[in-house]
Amino acid sequence: LDPEGITVAPDGTYWLASEGDASGERPNRLVQTDTLGNVLQEVTLPKRIEKCRSKTTSVGSLGSGFEGVTVAQGPLPGIAPWAGPRRYFLLVAQQRGWNYTTPGCRWLDDDPFDLNADEPFATRIWVYDMKRDKWKHVFYLLESVPSDASWVGLSEITRVEGGFVVIERDNRSGDFGEIKWLVHFSDSALADGIVTHAEKEVYDLLPDLNATNGWITDKPEGVAVTPAGELYVVTDNDGVEDWSGETRFLRLGKFAGLFD
């Protein structure tokens, strides 16, 4: 496993998002556990997606998979408008877009017209309906890659009242980092199956990351909103290999005022 995200379900169990690797030996999956960490079940992506991933020669972004997971109760526009509030769904942030060269898979990837095959302009927010054991997805349009970066992707998704917050970021650190964003979008953005640039409300994390005049990490990684409405962000320290090992834990205040 490579746990990258965690959320609490209404029944008190935990769901973890585990990121897969490019080879497919470690698949992207959701893992449900009890409060003691005992695994209750594991869920992988649909077989046709896994088959396309296993046969494609375009593997550059396939190692950037499940990064965050959150729970949302129904109804959800465009996904489950019929669902009642007792029905819950898991929404999973896929870090970067995947492109398939496999015959027959073109319309299953994130760049079906091969506009930017090496680094698709869109990624996905997967939606898993546990009761039906069905997957759906919503496309998420990523910002343009800055000149000094290799890619832009997502690294978290968190449920808030009436919408969601994701982290969208580039892969550069220090003075080279340009996109370190919290992005809020409302439930209505899901209705047409794509979160567009116009539907994003952005909070720039760079001033907060730079407030101590230290090195700016490339990886804001986790977001949580407390019952009192306080929003927290944590960075990934990436251990100490080619990195200082620092972790930043940011308290950004009330969520309600961040995107005004």
Task: List where the protein language model places each region.
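Sequence/structural signature of beta-propeller domains
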Residues: 1-260
